[in-house]
Amino acid sequence: MTENIDTANIDAIKNKTLKRTANRANKEVFFRRRKGCPLSAPDGTAPIITYKDPDLLSKFISECGRVLPARVTNVCRSKQRELTKAIKIARELALLPFVYHQ
């Protein structure tokens, strides 16, 4: 009653299941729920975005001097616009540098 089973076929099936589970893991990481906006706390403890606070604004600027995108900083759309405007004003008033030289 024992049948002769091809081991190459079993290996192919194992590889398919491994790929399938790896794809699921990748999707779970990709579709992971984002944390809330750090600048929009519901209890009112969120910092106020203003050009007068270069310490807060510098957290959202890269080493090169560019404004970090919202997908990196997890900031909501409206706060990202406020940040961008405040950073541009702070640059014009020489509170923040336009470019960081290394």
Swiss-Prot record:
Single GO MF annotation: small ribosomal subunit rRNA binding
Domain of life: Bacteria
One GO BP annotation of this record: translation
This protein's GO CC annotations: cytosolic small ribosomal subunit
Keywords from the UniProt entry: Ribonucleoprotein, Ribosomal protein, RNA-binding, rRNA-binding
SUPFAM superfamilies linked to this entry: Ribosomal protein S18
Pfam families assigned: Ribosomal_S18 (PF01084)
Stated family: Belongs to the bacterial ribosomal protein bS18 family.
Record-linked PANTHER family: 30S RIBOSOMAL PROTEIN S18 (PTHR13479), SMALL RIBOSOMAL SUBUNIT PROTEIN BS18M (PTHR13479:SF40)
Record note on quaternary structure: Part of the 30S ribosomal subunit. Forms a tight heterodimer with protein bS6.
Alphabetical list of NCBIfam families matching this protein: S18
Job description of the protein: Binds as a heterodimer with protein bS6 to the central domain of the 16S rRNA, where it helps stabilize the platform of the 30S subunit.
Protein's name according to its UniProt entry: Small ribosomal subunit protein bS18
Gene: rpsR
